[in-house]
């Protein structure tokens, strides 16, 4: 069963904020993936879900993408996600990519890895590095 968020939501737990951003797209289910921002004293982490560059730009045009410390790459590092506009706005120092080893889709895509290198991001990948833990 899928549940759709109808509006943005902010949850606060002490000094940690959890922002849930929504957009409305009729292009595909992936474009309606929730975008989640963990905003803490020491580290801001952005997760854009399975959105493509189109969905990422929807968030950008709505003013929902701040600068962050860590970005979880969109759609497992596919070539159509984690676009240059998103990287320029978010300016992440670190990018984590969740992808299975030897997956059928070839994630993460070489184009995405090159974009991340061009932006000077430190990249961690579950297919290569295993479980990723972020501590600050």
Regions picked out by a protein language model, each given a short descriptive name:
Residues 1-136:
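Non-globular, low-confidence helical/coil segments that flank catalytic cores
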